[in-house]
């Protein structure tokens, strides 16, 4: 297995690799965190601790599927750590004693300035390397905490200042995606002394309704609630927020820990290319186990070698220059689909989708059960390629629109 140096320095702390557990059930106690370290994770954000002790519901999870796939989206109704504060602090102490070279980040959540300041002091005394301020849990809003705080720049700035009074450790502010402009809150966190941003937390959601009982899922004694949604389905949302943060002139160099739908090395590379420097994972671990880090580290190592990068740092943020406003995109040409008839299985998916959801440009030969593109009707949307189950449709002939001057293209 190829292994390159995947170490990265983030907010002044050196991580052996960028892969971390996010604050969640996967890092809830000493035993779980020790196993994660032994498996190869570079850092752990211990499940959020506070003076509030959670009393969890049962059941507390739901998921969303697509056809015959595993779940693509995951709903959880968990709150912060259910163990007493001293028990959590003892776990942090023991982890740092047993794994001094691994990074341990303490996630904290308070109800007021005094609690934020005291929690920061306590986790620094316990040996944590960094602090993550959880301003974004959707399940904690009724306790004057969680994502409601993360929607208020004033509260975020105030609580960041309180944490800085209690500790000298590097501090991250964890952002909620349940907001229109994350940059405004990130700037408030920066003013308050935050050293970086962690984003995104889960998206407020209702995943499913039991059609017979007319109750949201999961059902807790005949009721349900809105709560956090995670997994592969939220990755595009996370990438969008990270790109917007990175392109803000006052946040360009502000460190970001990326979270949201990371399961593979390709996912990891996408977050890095948009500007995240460390990566946090929960739902992928819940679905596949801690050992996914082995494939992610190996795949990322091969990618660095193939691309000629000497270090992980060299690739961070490289894709941002190619994300531009929609009105600035080149609209001078059409790309027609190219169909590999040898790979085509004659399922007709492209024909149906084009006829019912496109521009009726895909024609169907019933005798040979093969599709053909009518370029007189085709607008080059490439819907056909996206629905093809065997990937036999890709980019083909390019035609410049009437009156447009031909020029070099990157497709």
UniProtKB/Swiss-Prot annotation:
<dbReference type="InterPro" id="IPR005720">
    <property type="entry name" value="Dihydroorotate_DH_cat"/>
</dbReference>
<feature type="domain" description="4Fe-4S ferredoxin-type 1">
    <location>
        <begin position="335"/>
        <end position="367"/>
    </location>
</feature>
<dbReference type="GO" id="GO:0006208">
    <property type="term" value="P:pyrimidine nucleobase catabolic process"/>
</dbReference>
<feature type="binding site">
    <location>
        <position position="354"/>
    </location>
    <ligand>
        <name>[4Fe-4S] cluster 2</name>
    </ligand>
</feature>
<feature type="binding site">
    <location>
        <position position="350"/>
    </location>
    <ligand>
        <name>[4Fe-4S] cluster 1</name>
    </ligand>
</feature>
<feature type="domain" description="4Fe-4S ferredoxin-type 2">
    <location>
        <begin position="369"/>
        <end position="398"/>
    </location>
</feature>
<comment type="similarity">
    <text>Belongs to the dihydropyrimidine dehydrogenase family.</text>
</comment>
<keyword id="KW-0479">Metal-binding</keyword>
<keyword id="KW-0408">Iron</keyword>
<feature type="binding site">
    <location>
        <position position="378"/>
    </location>
    <ligand>
        <name>[4Fe-4S] cluster 2</name>
    </ligand>
</feature>
<dbReference type="Pfam" id="PF14697">
    <property type="entry name" value="Fer4_21"/>
</dbReference>
<dbReference type="GO" id="GO:0046872">
    <property type="term" value="F:metal ion binding"/>
</dbReference>
<keyword id="KW-0004">4Fe-4S</keyword>
<dbReference type="GO" id="GO:0005737">
    <property type="term" value="C:cytoplasm"/>
</dbReference>
<dbReference type="InterPro" id="IPR013785">
    <property type="entry name" value="Aldolase_TIM"/>
</dbReference>
<comment type="function">
    <text>Involved in pyrimidine base degradation. Catalyzes physiologically the reduction of uracil to 5,6-dihydrouracil (DHU) by using NADH as a specific cosubstrate. It also catalyzes the reverse reaction and the reduction of thymine to 5,6-dihydrothymine (DHT).</text>
</comment>
<feature type="binding site">
    <location>
        <position position="388"/>
    </location>
    <ligand>
        <name>[4Fe-4S] cluster 1</name>
    </ligand>
</feature>
<keyword id="KW-0560">Oxidoreductase</keyword>
<feature type="binding site">
    <location>
        <begin position="134"/>
        <end position="136"/>
    </location>
    <ligand>
        <name>substrate</name>
    </ligand>
</feature>
<feature type="binding site">
    <location>
        <position position="76"/>
    </location>
    <ligand>
        <name>substrate</name>
    </ligand>
</feature>
<comment type="subunit">
    <text>Heterotetramer of 2 PreA and 2 PreT subunits.</text>
</comment>
<feature type="binding site">
    <location>
        <position position="384"/>
    </location>
    <ligand>
        <name>[4Fe-4S] cluster 2</name>
    </ligand>
</feature>
<feature type="binding site">
    <location>
        <begin position="201"/>
        <end position="202"/>
    </location>
    <ligand>
        <name>substrate</name>
    </ligand>
</feature>
<keyword id="KW-0677">Repeat</keyword>
<dbReference type="GO" id="GO:0004159">
    <property type="term" value="F:dihydropyrimidine dehydrogenase (NAD+) activity"/>
</dbReference>
<dbReference type="Pfam" id="PF01180">
    <property type="entry name" value="DHO_dh"/>
</dbReference>
<feature type="active site" description="Nucleophile">
    <location>
        <position position="137"/>
    </location>
</feature>
<dbReference type="GO" id="GO:0051539">
    <property type="term" value="F:4 iron, 4 sulfur cluster binding"/>
</dbReference>
<feature type="binding site">
    <location>
        <position position="381"/>
    </location>
    <ligand>
        <name>[4Fe-4S] cluster 2</name>
    </ligand>
</feature>
<feature type="binding site">
    <location>
        <position position="347"/>
    </location>
    <ligand>
        <name>[4Fe-4S] cluster 1</name>
    </ligand>
</feature>
<keyword id="KW-0411">Iron-sulfur</keyword>
<dbReference type="GO" id="GO:0003954">
    <property type="term" value="F:NADH dehydrogenase activity"/>
</dbReference>
<protein>
    <recommendedName>
        <fullName>NAD-dependent dihydropyrimidine dehydrogenase subunit PreA</fullName>
        <ecNumber>1.3.1.1</ecNumber>
    </recommendedName>
</protein>
<dbReference type="InterPro" id="IPR017900">
    <property type="entry name" value="4Fe4S_Fe_S_CS"/>
</dbReference>
<feature type="binding site">
    <location>
        <position position="344"/>
    </location>
    <ligand>
        <name>[4Fe-4S] cluster 1</name>
    </ligand>
</feature>
<dbReference type="InterPro" id="IPR017896">
    <property type="entry name" value="4Fe4S_Fe-S-bd"/>
</dbReference>
<keyword id="KW-0520">NAD</keyword>
């Amino acid at each position: 297995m190829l292994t390159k140096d995947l170490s990265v320095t983030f907010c002044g702390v050196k991580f052996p690799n960028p892969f971390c557990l996010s604050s969640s059930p996967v890092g809830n106690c000493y035993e779980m965190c020790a196993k994660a370290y032994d498996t190869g994770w570079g850092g752990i954000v211990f499940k959020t601790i506070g003076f509030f002790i959670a009393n969890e519901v049962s059941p507390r999870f739901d998921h969303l599927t697509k056809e015959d796939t595993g779940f693509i989206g995951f709903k959880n109704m968990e709150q912060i750590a259910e163990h007493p504060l001293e028990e959590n602090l003892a776990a942090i102490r023991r982890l740092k004693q047993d794994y001094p070279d691994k990074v341990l980040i303490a996630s904290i959540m308070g109800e007021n300035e005094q609690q934020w300041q005291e929690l920061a002091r306590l986790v620094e005394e316990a040996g944590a390397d960094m602090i993550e301020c959880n301003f974004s849990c959707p399940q904690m809003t009724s306790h004057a905490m969680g994502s409601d705080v993360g929607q208020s720049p004033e509260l975020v700035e105030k609580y960041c200042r309180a944490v800085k009074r209690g500790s000298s450790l590097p501090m991250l502010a964890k952002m909620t995606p349940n907001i229109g402009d994350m940059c405004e809150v990130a700037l408030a966190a920066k003013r308050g002394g935050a050293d970086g941003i962690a984003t995104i937390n889960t998206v407020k959601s209702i995943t499913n309704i039991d059609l017979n009982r007319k109750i949201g899922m999961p059902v807790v004694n005949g009721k349900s609630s809105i709560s956090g949604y995670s997994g592969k389905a939220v990755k595009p949302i996370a990438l969008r927020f990270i790109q917007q943060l990175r392109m803000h002139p006052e946040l360009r160099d502000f460190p970001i820990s990326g979270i949201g739908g990371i399961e593979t090395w390709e996912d990891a590379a996408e977050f890095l290319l948009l500007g995240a420097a460390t990566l946090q994972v929960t739902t992928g671990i819940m679905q596949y186990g801690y050992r996914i880090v082995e494939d992610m580290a190996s795949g990322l190592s091969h990618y660095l070698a193939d691309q000629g990068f000497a270090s992980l740092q060299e690739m961070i943020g490289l894709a941002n220059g190619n994300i531009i406003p929609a009105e600035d995109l080149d609209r001078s040409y059409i790309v027609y689909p190219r169909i590999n008839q040898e790979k085509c299985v004659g399922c007709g998916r492209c024909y149906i989708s084009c006829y019912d959801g496109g521009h009726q440009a895909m024609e169907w030969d019933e005798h040979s059960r093969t599709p053909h593109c009518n370029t007189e009707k085709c607008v080059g949307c490439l819907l056909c390629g996206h629905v093809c189950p065997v990937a036999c449709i890709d980019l083909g002939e390019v035609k410049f629109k009437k009156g447009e001057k031909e020029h070099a293209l990157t497709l």
